Amino acid sequence: MGTRDEYLRGLSRRVYDKLKDNREFTTLYNDAQRAGRSAPTVRGAAPTAAESFGEGSLEQAMRRDRERSGLHVESFESAQPPPYVDGVLAFVGYMLSYRWMNLLAYQEAFTSGPQAFGVDEVYGALVDFDHWLTPPPRTAHEDQIKLHQLLSQLSAGYMRPLVAYNPWSAARDNGRTLKRVLDALDARGFVGVKIYPPNGYRPYGNARYGLPVAGAPTGRELDDALMLLWTQCADRGKPVMAHSGHSMGKSDAYEDMAGPLGWRELLRALSEQGKVARINAGHFGGDANTNTWTEEIAKLMATPEGAALFADLGYWDELRCSGAPRMCEATRRLADAATAHPVLNERVMYGSDWLMLSQERRWDRYPFDVLAATRTFLNTNALFGGNAKKCFGA
C-alpha cells in the first residue's frame, strides 16, 4: 500500500481523473479558489495565490490541512468568511482514506501535535445505512466491527468504538443484527451503540408518528426493534448515541425524525418499563437557528425521565463566531438554554463529528473555539471530559 503520502498522491490523481471533465465542478472550484485566496484578511494573514483544479489539488489540500497552514475564520476581515474549497477536497480525501490514516490524522491534530488541544480519547461511531440508502456497504458489518476493535487495541484504547444498530435490519433478520451488536458490547470492547434517525425513523414512537418509507417495516415493527436495543443497553449500562440535528436526511421529513418528539416518546416508554437508558443526543439539536430543538432537548434533560439524557456539541461550527450575527446567534441560544436549564452543566459534552468537521477551516482549532464560546456559561471541566465519563464510562 505504501506510505500515507504515496496513497494520497495516487488518490489525488484518481479524483482529478474522475472530475476533470466536469465543467460545472471545475468552474465552481476555480472561481471559489480565486474568491477565497483574494479575500481581505487581517494584518499579518497574507492571502495566497489561487490554484486551478489539477491532479495534485487534493494532495495539496490534504498537505495544507495536515500542516495547519490554512487561515482561521478569524483571519478574514469580513463577517462571513469566503468559500473554502480546500475543505471540500480534504473532506473527500479523508472519506476515501484508510481508517488508520484518519485516526492518525485526528490524533496528530487534537492530541500529539505541538499545538494540539489535548484530547485524551476519542469515541469512533460506526453507522449502518443498510436498506435506507443504497448500495449496501462493500465491507460486511462484522468485518467493520473487527477492524474498529483492532484500531482500539492498537491505539491502546485511545479510540473507543461504538457499534451501529439498524432497526430495519433488526426487524427482518431474526435477531442477527441485535446479536452482532450485543457481541460487540459484551466481547469486543465497544462502549456504546450508534443509531441514525435521519435515515427515516424516530428513536421511538414510529407506530404513531412515523414516516412511511417504501419497503420498510411498519412503525410498530421499528419500535419493537428499537425497544429491544434500548432495554438491552439499559440493562448493560451502555449508552446509545443518535443524530439529533435537523440535517443529513433525504428531505425535511426525514430530518424531522431526529427531533425531540421521538425522544419524548422514548423516555416515556422507558419510564413505563422502569428502565433508564443512557442517551447521547448527538449535535444537541443542531447549531442552526431554524428550530427550538436544543431548548426542547434541554427541557427533557431536566425531567425525571431524562435523568440519563446527555448531548454533545459535535459540529456546532457556528460557535466559531467570527462576528457574523447568524453565527454568534448559536452561542447566544446555547447560553440561554444553559441559563434556563442548569442541568446542562451536568450533561453537555464536547464533540467534534470530526469527519464532517474536516471540511472546515482549521478544524484542529475547533475545541479551542468551543472553549472560548462556552467558558462563561458552561463548566469547562464537565464539558471537556467529566460529562463524557458519566455518559460513556470512565
Question: What residue ranges belong to the model's regions?
Answer:
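Well-ordered, non-membrane alpha-helical segments in soluble/globular domains
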Residues: 70-72, 78-110, 134-151, 174-183, ...
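A structural motif corresponding to the C-terminal end of an alpha-helix
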Residues: 106-120, 150-159, 188, 228-238, ...
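H/E-rich (His + Asp/Glu) clusters that bind or coordinate divalent metals
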Residues: 272-394
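Mid-to-C-terminal alpha-helical segments outside catalytic/metal-binding sites
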Residues: 2-97, 101-107, 191, 197, ...
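Active-site gating/metal-coordination segments in enzymes
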Residues: 115-256, 310, 315
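Aromatic- and acidic-residue-enriched segments that line the glycan-binding/catalytic groove
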Residues: 2-14, 135-140, 250-263
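Noncatalytic carbohydrate-binding groove/subsite architecture in carbohydrate-active enzymes
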Residues: 228, 232-239, 243-247, 266, ...
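Active-site metal-binding loops of divalent metal-dependent hydrolases
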Residues: 1, 127, 244, 284, ...
